[in-house]
Amino acid sequence: MMQIPKPKDSIWTDDQWSAIVSSGRDILVAAAAGSGKTAVLVERMIRKITAEEDPVDVDRLLVVTFTNASAAEMKHRIAEALEKELAKNPGSLHIRRQLSLLNRASISTLHSFCLQVLKKYYYMIDLDPGFRMADQTEGELLGDEVLDELFEDEYAKGNQAFFELADRYTTDRHDLDLQDLVKRVYEYSRSHPDPEVWLQSFVRLYDVTEESKMEELPFYQYVKEDAEMALFGAKQKLEKALELTKAPGGPAPRADNFLDDLQQIEELISCRHDFDALYERVPAVSFKRAKAVKGDEFDKALLDEATDLRNGAKKLIEKVKTDYFTRSPQDHLKSLADMKPVIETLVQLVISYGKRFEAAKQEKSIIDFSDLEHYCLAILTAVDEEGRRVPSEAAVYYQDQFHEVLVDEYQDTNLVQESILQLVKSGNEEAGNLFMVGDVKQSIYRFRLAEPLLFLGKYKRFTESGAGAGQKIDLNQNFRSRSDILDSTNFLFKQLMGGKIGEVDYDEQAALKLGASYPPNDAAKTELLLIDSADGADSSEDAEDFETVHWEAKAIAGEIRKLVSSPFKVYDGKTKTHRNIQYRDIVILLRSMPWAPQLMEELKNQGIPVYANLTSGYFEAVEVAAALSVLKVIDNPYQDIPLASVLRSPIVGCDENELALIRLEKKKAPFYEALKAYLANADRHDELYQKLRTFYDSLQKWRSFSTNHSVSELIWEVYRDTGYFDYAGGMPGGKQRQANLRVLYDRARSYEATAFRGLFRFLRFIERMQERGDDLGTARALSEQEDVVRLMTIHSSKGLEFPVVFTAGLGRSFNMMDLNKSYLLDKELGFGTKYIHPELRISYPTLPLVAMKKKMRRELLSEELRVLYVALTRAKEKLFLVGSCKNREKQLAKWQAQADRADWLLSEFDRYQASSYLDFIGPALIRHRDMEAHRTPGLSSSEDIARDPSRFHIRMLQQSELLEENPKERAEEKSKRLKAIQQGEPIPDSFSFDDQARRLLEWEYPYRELTAIRTKQSVSELKRKQEYEDEYSGRSLIKPSGDTLLYRRPGFMMKKGLTAAEKGTAMHTVMQHIPLTHVPTAEEAERTVRMLYEKELLTEEQQEAIDIEEIVQFFGTEIGKDLLRALRIDREVPFSMALPAGEVYKDAETAGEPLLVQGIIDCLYETADGLYLLDYKTDRIEGKFRNGFEGAAPILQKRYETQIELYTKAVEQITKTKVKGRALYFFDGGHVLTL
């Protein structure tokens, strides 16, 4: 069909005009952020409705939107456009008819359309016409009941196949894990148009024999891709290390090592297509001991960098070996074959559950959202004589009814929805009537099982002319944002989005083009605020999210204050003028909301009004928790925690001492029995007895009341009898608290409208809501319409726009927890699980599970890139990127290493390693000319990158900078105060202090120093205190940070990098376990380290940190030889010893108070001469102290003398034996310090 020419005075761009008027085939419009897609969609509909020739009635258009709000907005825009047309032509009956038809037009979400289909054609699938939509929690509870009955039946049948499945997926205590697995698989299968067919496809992954070829199995493609990426990544690192040997001062002696390593890696790459060959070669790879590099002519920084690169390559090869080649191909295949009958049983169990669940819902005449789609699909589908699926009569009706099917946000469609759309549209792609609008770069609903590959497949298949397939139209002109926003977004995503990471190539067609007109503003540059959370302190490496959000909130608050007090102008779309920025022009975007309360608190503390739609906190409210505890006790009084909670609450009013008195009645029995025993003593008539008697009598009354009344009536009876509703009203925030209690009552009433009844089920209903995180939320004091800073998730911001955007929390790690499960589900591959031996109870990942993990990691990273794209494209006039890192210099060096390439697109390997948004942004941004001051010379980059028009303002912030008071604000406050005094006016409140209040607030506890002394101290803590003591007073001049860790970090946190203390712990662990029968060789030491890792006494990071040379070197020293000759050796000797406080704290106010000192002595050994004490140290010596160890010795002696004195005192006190000698051994340099 010929395209209608665009009028000369048209406001539309050529591409927009093409999207408005093109027809005659399926059309896919790839509409970038801010490109006006909604306006184009509405205009297309209006032109069809008001066409002079062959106009289309509005009810002959099916318009599918993603949300109900979008549908309402679409109808509103169409109504406005029709009203304008009617004003031009008041006599038009056709336009008046369209306005009357608009309310019944099919402009809705797909779920709403499915509901229409079901109401019209319910009889085709034997559906009760009186069906209703089930509450989500109601559906889950019904599903639980069905599943319980199914499992009971399976157990009763004595089905051996079921027992084998249960043996593998249950514990010896319950079968909840297997129930969760069945529900999860069932729910996931519902995203497929034919769930049973998809479930049956599981088995093909496990349908193998020992003769099967690994390369022919469905999952092997992802195994091969991952292994290839790791091998090429290792090669890349070693090539870089080899380059460093050629640099001035580089570690030239290690060139041979790197060449040998490279040769081995290249041999692996040459046979990467052959799994059997890789199995033979990967385990045989051996990285020889690195040659020593000594002398002043070598640059230590280059040596360290080369060492890190080689270690990185070693870790990659070790990971490939661990993932794929610790077992032979035949063993892998046998594991899959062994799991086949188990998987078949699981599939049948899930299918049975699905059928029973559907029958249970039909019995109650309820359906859920998943049923809406599947029942609609069933109505629209028929089977012909040859067994093929074809459109049913109902589908043909809709094909005739709808002139065109228009789909908004097509990138978020799933497979079931696509099947429905294909059945209601007419014609094939080349002559169809399906009009799809979306942006695959904004597909961010993977958790709802959206399928962006549907969009990508059509985008690759369709052509611009529409010849041979559908037509694709690109709308890439952005009418929302300044050029600064677009240029910076393009600069980042050209480097980040492409290939398998991103799933779409960010090429010239995808890049954003300027469409809006703004006056020049140098302050509109995109800003990066990078906060160094370490701030030079080692202990801050383990800073929790709480600290990170605190510093980011301070930085953001400072920028907001500067913005609102500056002449920064924003364009107001309502007044069509530029005006000063207001709080409501600013939004803070977060990936998720856990940070929101702390951010809000900090902003409020700084006087910045802020609003967030928080949907949590309801169940944690004290009044709601108390009311729920009462209900739990009414249901079952033998629940200790709810009962104690009620007794402690204002409802009964017991204090801790009274609770203890009750418990003393029956120490081992349930608390309810203790309470009854207390009441059984008729001689008691004290206040506690009266309180308990009143409560007990009320409880019996409520329990009786609950048997013949509804839950809502019971709740109101409790409120009335206890007066708790009125009491809550008198508490701070009383109106809110009463509202919360009313919500609980209302929730009980709505629960009773479901198919369930009874108090027990209501409590399970509430527990289910809490487990799912479906919090009812609490009301907020500020509304969204007020002049406040908005705080929301990136997902919530989709489709919105704001003059100023802060994208915060960029350093937070991505949530990859799903990848650590014992099983994974994938739409393409099916079900991947661990191999589980039913008798030995051992398990390990099967290759399908590993393959799915690698595939899903790519998909998750692609999704995160799209989420970041959405965040950046919300900004109209100013964009801030805010993130924190733990060691800025190290982070910058890492980014530079990743960015050292000429291509625009960063390597897939480096992007695959990303664990946060900063890991994406940093390597891309460090190539920018505005980052030149923060990188070292010599970065490879193209001229295009250097000439890119984007502008950034890079700011590296220390925590100390954020603590400093603003001098300008301080001067303003001083000026206000002086002015008030001069004019005889009251001094502003911030300077007014009441004397009595001042005395109260400034009073200090006279024995405060004693509160800082714990009755139990470790030697390490005392040693740290000693380091800070002033030699004259003994008091601490520089106190250790409150962030200092008192406990060892768990292993999973060590993956983020080891502290010096953790490296020291690793060395001590090796010295504790290494055999002392003879001088160990390097190979024997390595075997010891490997053994400790396999026994999980060392983490992988600690294993890598061990310096074998330093351990071997120790046994070559005189003290090492003495140790091997010893008559008796005790390692890691724990002790506890009581000392007067005065011996530890010089000026403690109660010097005679006993203090328990604990410690662990590294090594005690006895020779013919006597008892010797040896302590190992991993302090860095070389290059840190002037004059080497000679200059370090006095400092180290003073540092450790307290520790060794306490060790000596403990040994002599406990063994009654004099210590003959004491020595410290320093691994760095092999130095011995005798004390």
Swiss-Prot record:
MF terms (GO), sorted A to Z: 3'-5' DNA helicase activity; 3'-5' exonuclease activity; ATP binding; ATP hydrolysis activity; double-stranded DNA binding
Occurrences of domain UvrD-like helicase ATP-binding (ranges): 10-482
Cofactor(s) required, per the database record: Mg(2+)
Catalytically driven reaction(s): Couples ATP hydrolysis with the unwinding of duplex DNA by translocating in the 3'-5' direction; ATP + H2O = ADP + phosphate + H(+)
PANTHER family: ATP-DEPENDENT HELICASE_NUCLEASE SUBUNIT A (PTHR11070:SF48), UVRD / RECB / PCRA DNA HELICASE FAMILY MEMBER (PTHR11070)
Assembly with partners or alone: Heterodimer of AddA and AddB/RexB.
Protein name, as recorded: ATP-dependent helicase/nuclease subunit A
Source species of the chain: Bacillus velezensis (strain DSM 23117 / BGSC 10A6 / LMG 26770 / FZB42) (Bacillus amyloliquefaciens subsp. plantarum)
